[in-house]
Each structure stands twice: as C-alpha cells, then as structure tokens.
C-alpha cells in the first residue's frame, strides 16, 4: 500500500519555506531558482542574508532534481553544505543554478551555484540524497520542478521567528514542534534544521555571519522539538541537533565557520559542551 507524501501544512496555511519566495524553473538539465532578499531574511544585528536560507534554497534546487530523478519515491537528504566567498548581500535578487553531479543506484548528488543580480558569485553548495527507506512512501500525484511564487515578499516576520526557532541560551537553539517543520517524508525538514544549527552557532558570535555550514543527516527527526547545541572556537563551530521528543536522539552533526569580525581575536571556546567539560575551579 502506498503512503501519500505530503509536505504541506494544514488547509489554509502556507508553509514557512514558501514565504522565502524561491521560484524555480527548468532550463535543460539545469534547475534555476531566484528570490528577492528582504530585511526579514537578514541575520539579526547585520545587513546580510542568512547563510541558512542559502542552504535551504540549495536543498530545494537539489531536492527537486532528486524528486525528478527518483519519483515516485521520496528523496531524503543525506548531506548538505553551503560555502560563501564573502558575506552575503543584504538586498537585490539571489539566483541559483542546480545541476546533478552523479545519479547512482542508491545516492544522487547535486551542486548549486549562487550569484547576485550582476552575475557575481555569492557561493556554492552541494547535497546528496537517497530514496526514503520506507518503499511505501511515494508521491501519489504528479510532481513538478517548476514552482512559481506570487510577486512580492511573503515573509512578514524575521525568518527565525516565522519558523518558530529561538535561541534558548548561548550555544543552544530550539525549533518548536509544528506542522510546518515536517517534509514530504514526514520528518523534520532539513532546511529548518540548518536554520536551527545556524542560530545555535551565531548565538555564540553576535554580529557575525556564517561563511560555511555543513550538515550530515544521521537519522530523521520524527517528533520534535529539534534542539541544536553548538561549541565555537576561533570562529569554527561544531553543532549537534537532537530530536527532543524522541529520547534526545542525535539526528544531525554540523560544522560552521563564521566570517572574521573585528571582535574575534583568538576567542576562547564557548558553548554548552565546553562549559560542561571545564574542570571545576578553573576560570
């Protein structure tokens, strides 16, 4: 018996990722995407687009290519990474081009390149996918890589707020459980996990933005909330994301790197892991 794949929230609701305005269309073997940047997409305290949003757009382009290749099976993300040449722009339009690098019997890999309005490079990313292990999970209606978005911004609140992601304490961010956190395989959306990991890392680096973010998806988050804990030293961070509603199981391990700021000069390690391991009596 087939299980219907449904990535949307309840009737009358709009999925948070649709609010990002990322429109896609096919061009030969490539998949193109674009969206205008609005202030609500900025990293708090900066005028730069969130790197996690670029990760989400990379995941979208690569994921749609995977859907097109393995449909009616539902793809799940194995790895996702994004790397920027310089801090991302804070206005204008971002353009992305996705291409399949390898399509094997079990794993599909796609790459994505991002540019600005003038064609200048912003950064690049890659993602790998496999078919969901549950063979009953299939798309039961036609799928399309062409996704039009109504003109104008749909994001009316800061992205983390709209997604239900909050910084709980230094080094810790929580993605609240909601219908919108789940994807077509009925697991926590990989792009929203990227946002949660970014928030955990940036909570230890106020005013900074991420130069890179890499995520390895170890097992699906099935219940939520998702809790990310980060440790950062000299701008390099490692992050673990756990499913708090499923016995705190480790779902994702991630690494991050911030662009240098004028306040970063051999900063000591910070984060909940470091504090827990610090010997008593040391300052």
Regions found by a protein language model. Give the residues of each.
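Structured N-terminal alpha/beta-domain signature
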Residues: 167-168, 173-175, 189, 193, ...
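HotDog/MaoC-like acyl-thioester-processing domains
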Residues: 64, 88-152, 219-223, 232-283
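Non-catalytic linker/capping segments at the edges of enzyme domains
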Residues: 1-40, 127-179, 269-283
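Intrinsic-disorder/low-complexity, polar/charged segments enriched in Ser/Thr/Lys/Arg/Asp/Glu/Gln
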Residues: 29-32, 79, 93-95, 124, ...
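Hydrophobic beta-strand-centered segment that forms part of the acyl-chain substrate-binding groove
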Residues: 62-95, 100, 195-233
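Short coil/loop residues immediately preceding or within conserved phosphate-binding loops
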Residues: 19, 79, 109, 212, ...
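Preference for bulky hydrophobic residues occupying beta-strand positions
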Residues: 35, 80-82, 112, 127, ...
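Hot-dog-fold acyl-thioester-processing enzymes
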Residues: 11, 18-19, 32-64, 174-202, ...
């Amino acid at each position: 018996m087939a299980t219907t794949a449904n990535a949307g929230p309840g009737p009358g609701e709009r999925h948070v990722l649709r609010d990002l305005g990322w429109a896609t269309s096919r061009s030969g073997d490539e998949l193109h995407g674009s969206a205008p940047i609005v202030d609500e997409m900025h990293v708090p305290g900066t005028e730069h687009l969130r790197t996690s949003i670029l990760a989400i757009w990379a995941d979208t382009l690569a994921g749609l290519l995977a859907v097109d290749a393995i449909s009616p099976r539902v793809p799940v993300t194995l790895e996702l990474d994004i790397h920027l040449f310089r801090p991302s722009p804070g206005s204008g339009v971002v353009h992305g081009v996705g291409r399949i690098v390898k399509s094997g019997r079990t794993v599909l890999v796609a790459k994505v390149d991002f540019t600005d309005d003038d064609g200048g490079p912003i950064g690049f990313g890659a993602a790998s996918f496999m078919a969901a292990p549950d063979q009953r999970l299939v798309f039961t209606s036609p799928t399309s890589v062409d996704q039009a978005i109504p003109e104008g911004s749909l994001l009316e609140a800061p992205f983390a707020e709209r997604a239900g992601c909050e910084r709980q304490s230094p080094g810790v961010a929580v993605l609240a459980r909601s219908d919108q956190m789940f994807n077509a395989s009925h697991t926590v959306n990989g792009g929203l996990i990227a946002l949660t990991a970014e928030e955990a890392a940036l909570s230890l680096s106020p005013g900074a933005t991420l130069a890179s973010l890499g995520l390895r998806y170890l097992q699906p988050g099935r219940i939520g909330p998702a809790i990310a804990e980060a440790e950062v030293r000299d701008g390099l961070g490692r992050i673990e994301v756990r499913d708090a509603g499923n016995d705190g199981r480790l779902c994702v391990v991630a690494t991050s790197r911030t662009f240098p700021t004028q306040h970063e000069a051999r900063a000591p390690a910070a984060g909940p892991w470091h504090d827990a391991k610090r010997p008593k009596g040391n300052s």
